[in-house]
């Protein structure tokens, strides 16, 4: 289960977010993006000491400041059910496809099948293609 798929499923559900500086935010998840930046609504912010509280209608939290997220167990169960329903876990699709990696034979990535010299002779850097029967410089 990937963290971002968990967050996408948790939209419109309550969650607790603790930041690296010790502050906590309790609210309902509105949205999240690929960098785990999140928007919360109906937020209660608690100071790191736990002695001050603020109520906010909405709040934006940068993903890189998050220490951890506490999400209800029912959300985790929903994500597990989605993974089973899709029938894919780690490597599910890759095992069905033909894999072309190291040691699997085939031509690989290069056109001529290897490294170094051994391509078409006479086509070096900036040199015209050599044609038999003509000398360079004489017309």
UniProtKB/Swiss-Prot annotation:
Residue positions where N-acetylmethionine is found in the record: 1
Function statement: Plays a role in pre-mRNA splicing as component of the U4/U6-U5 tri-snRNP complex that is involved in spliceosome assembly, and as component of the precatalytic spliceosome (spliceosome B complex). The heptameric LSM2-8 complex binds specifically to the 3'-terminal U-tract of U6 snRNA.
Composition bias type Gly residues, residue spans: 102-125
Keywords, alphabetical: Acetylation, Isopeptide bond, mRNA processing, mRNA splicing, Nucleus, Ribonucleoprotein, RNA-binding, Spliceosome, Ubl conjugation
Pfam families registered for this protein in UniProt: LSM
Disordered as annotated region, ranges: 87-139
GO biological process: mRNA splicing, via spliceosome; nuclear-transcribed mRNA catabolic process; P-body assembly; RNA splicing; spliceosomal snRNP assembly
Protein name (database record): U6 snRNA-associated Sm-like protein LSm4
Record has tRNA processing as a keyword: no
Keyword Transcription regulation found: no
Cellular localisation: Nucleus
An annotated GO cellular component: Lsm2-8 complex
Domain annotation Sm: ranges: 2-75
Superkingdom of this protein's organism: Eukaryota
GO MF annotation list: PH domain binding; RNA binding; U6 snRNA binding
Family statement drawn from the similarity comment of this UniProt entry: Belongs to the snRNP Sm proteins family.
Signal peptide limits: none
